């Protein structure tokens, strides 16, 4: 995304952290328009009607934008290369053994690299800078409804190849749960970037956080949950199997095929839904 101006006095280094206060202090319509245009390209790739990221939303939220850009000395223009939007959210999580966790997790909410600079290491530079600024490790990151391409990127660049899908469409990695330890089923673990509480396995999960469409057996005034292993694990062809290795085609043709498949599945879901009128 191109801006016909020198943004070095405004943004500073080529990798920059923009929190809500910093974005509000920019007061530059050209920068705002360039960020919004880059976010629209991200939404277009995900087949979304409205972008997930705008400067107005960032100013009125607790999210942080990590932006990569460069200045072209020959053409005297600035180019925005990509961005990552992150925020901290309180989530209830399940591991592969259905142990329940509660914690404030660093979440990747939006991530995009301009198509003209993809596969040049820009995406990894952005995430590496984000991890250093947030004092976090790759396994501590939660992904908000990621695509197969993003899961393949995390597997290829960071070795995160065991995703655990949650019923909230967030994805965390099995290494996160392996790093936690508990005593007698209940415990707390503190990191610089997150805090988790492990629920007692004898207690049922909090209301509203049970996995949907799960058969139940009613007893004497109590509700016991029976987990079906084949239902919990999901289907590998959908790319959201519980703790299943990621098998994604990272070639340009494969990325386009993944996006086309996701758009086709989303269109079929919309057409099969009952109209509201």
From Swiss-Prot:
InterPro entries: Atat, GNAT_ATAT. Its EC number is 2.3.1.108. It is an enzyme of class 2 (transferase). Pfam families: Acetyltransf_16. GO terms for cellular component: microtubule. GO terms for molecular function: tubulin N-acetyltransferase activity. It comes from the Eukaryota. Acetyl-CoA binds at residues 111-124. Residues 1-177 form the N-acetyltransferase domain. GO terms for biological process: microtubule cytoskeleton organization; neuron development; regulation of microtubule cytoskeleton organization. It catalyses: L-lysyl-[alpha-tubulin] + acetyl-CoA = N(6)-acetyl-L-lysyl-[alpha-tubulin] + CoA + H(+). Disulfide bonds: none annotated. The keyword Acyltransferase applies. Keywords: Acyltransferase, Transferase. Specifically acetylates 'Lys-40' in alpha-tubulin/mec-12 on the lumenal side of microtubules. Promotes microtubule destabilization and accelerates microtubule dynamics; this activity may be independent of acetylation activity. Acetylates alpha-tubulin with a slow enzymatic rate, due to a catalytic site that is not optimized for acetyl transfer. Enters the microtubule through each end and diffuses quickly throughout the lumen of microtubules. Belongs to the acetyltransferase ATAT1 family. This is Alpha-tubulin N-acetyltransferase 1. The lineage of its organism: Eukaryota, Metazoa, Ecdysozoa, Nematoda, Chromadorea.
């Amino acid at each position: 995304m191109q801006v016909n101006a020198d943004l070095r006095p405004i943004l500073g280094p080529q990798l920059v952290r923009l929190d809500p206060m910093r974005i509000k202090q920019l007061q530059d319509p050209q920068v705002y328009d360039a960020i919004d245009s880059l976010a629209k390209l991200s939404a277009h790739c995900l087949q979304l009607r409205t972008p997930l990221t705008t400067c107005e939303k960032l100013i009125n939220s607790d999210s942080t934008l990590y932006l990569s850009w460069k200045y072209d000395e020959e053409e005297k223009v600035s180019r925005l290369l990509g961005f990552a939007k992150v925020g901290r959210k309180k989530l209830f999580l399940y591991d592969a053994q259905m142990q329940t966790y509660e914690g404030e997790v660093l979440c990747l909410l939006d991530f995009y690299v301009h198509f003209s600079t993809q596969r040049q290491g820009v995406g990894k530079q952005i995430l590496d800078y984000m991890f250093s600024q947030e004092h976090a490790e790759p396994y501590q990151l939660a992904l908000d409804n990621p695509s197969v391409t993003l899961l393949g990127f995390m597997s290829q660049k960071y070795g995160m190849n065991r995703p655990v899908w949650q019923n909230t469409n967030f994805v965390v990695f099995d290494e996160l749960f392996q790093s936690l330890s508990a005593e007698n089923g209940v415990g707390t673990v503190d990191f610089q970037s997150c805090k988790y509480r492990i629920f007692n396995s004898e207690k049922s999960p909090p209301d509203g956080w049970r996995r949907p469409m799960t058969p139940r057996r009613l007893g004497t005034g109590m509700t016991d949950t029976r987990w079906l292993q084949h239902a919990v694990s999901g289907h590998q062809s959908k790319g959201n199997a519980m703790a299943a290795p990621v098998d994604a085609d990272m070639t340009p043709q494969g990325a386009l095929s993944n996006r086309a498949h996701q758009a086709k599945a989303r269109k079929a879901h919309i057409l099969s839904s009952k109209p509201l009128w």
